[in-house]
Amino acid sequence: MMNVITVVGIILSVVCTISDAEGVDCTLPSDTGRCKAYFIRYFYNQKAGECQKFVYGGCEGNSNNFLTKSDCCKQCSPGKC
C-alpha cells in the first residue's frame, strides 16, 4: 500500500511541475501588476541574461514571476545560474 501511495505522489509531483512550466514566458518584462502590495520576486531579464529582483504588487502581472531566484533559474536559464 505504501508503494502505491509513493508512486501516486511522484506522478502528481511530475504532473504539477509540467503544468507549471507550460505557462511560463521568460521573454516577458517584469510586471508589478495593479495592486499595491510589496513582494520581492524574481523575473528573467532576457537582455541581461539573468534572473533579477523586482517588486510585485500581489495581483495580475505576468508569468515571468518567481518566488525565488532558484525557481527563476530552473525555468528560464537552466545551467546558467
From Swiss-Prot:
Alphabetized GO MF terms: potassium channel regulator activity; serine-type endopeptidase inhibitor activity; toxin activity
GO cellular component: extracellular region; extracellular space; host cell membrane
Residue ranges of every copy of the BPTI/Kunitz inhibitor domain listed in the record: 26-76
Compartment(s) of residence: Secreted
Consequence recorded when altering K36A: Decrease in potency to inhibit plasmin
GO annotation (BP), single: venom-mediated suppression of fibrinolysis in another organism
Keywords: Disulfide bond, Hemostasis impairing toxin, Ion channel impairing toxin, Potassium channel impairing toxin, Protease inhibitor, Secreted, Serine protease inhibitor, Signal, Toxin, Voltage-gated potassium channel impairing toxin
InterPro entries in the cross-refs: Kunitz_BPTI, Kunitz_BPTI_sf, Prtase_inh_Kunz-CS, TFPI/VKTCI-like
Residues annotated as site: Reactive bond for serine proteases: K36, A37
Signal peptide per UniProt: 1-21
Tissue-wise expression: Expressed by the venom gland.
Source organism, top-level taxon: Eukaryota
Disulfide bond sites: C26-C76, C35-C59, C51-C72, C73-C81
One family name in Pfam for this protein: Kunitz_BPTI
Family recorded in the similarity comment: Belongs to the venom Kunitz-type family. Scorpion delta-Ktx subfamily. Delta-Ktx 3 sub-subfamily.
Stated role: Multifunctional toxin which inhibits serine proteases and potassium channels. Potently inhibits plasmin (Ki=8.75 nM), trypsin, chymotrypsin and elastase. Also inhibits mKv1.3/KCNA3 potassium channel currents (IC(50)=371.3 nM).
Stated name of the protein: Kunitz-type serine protease inhibitor BmKTT-2
Lineage: Eukaryota, Metazoa, Ecdysozoa, Arthropoda, Chelicerata
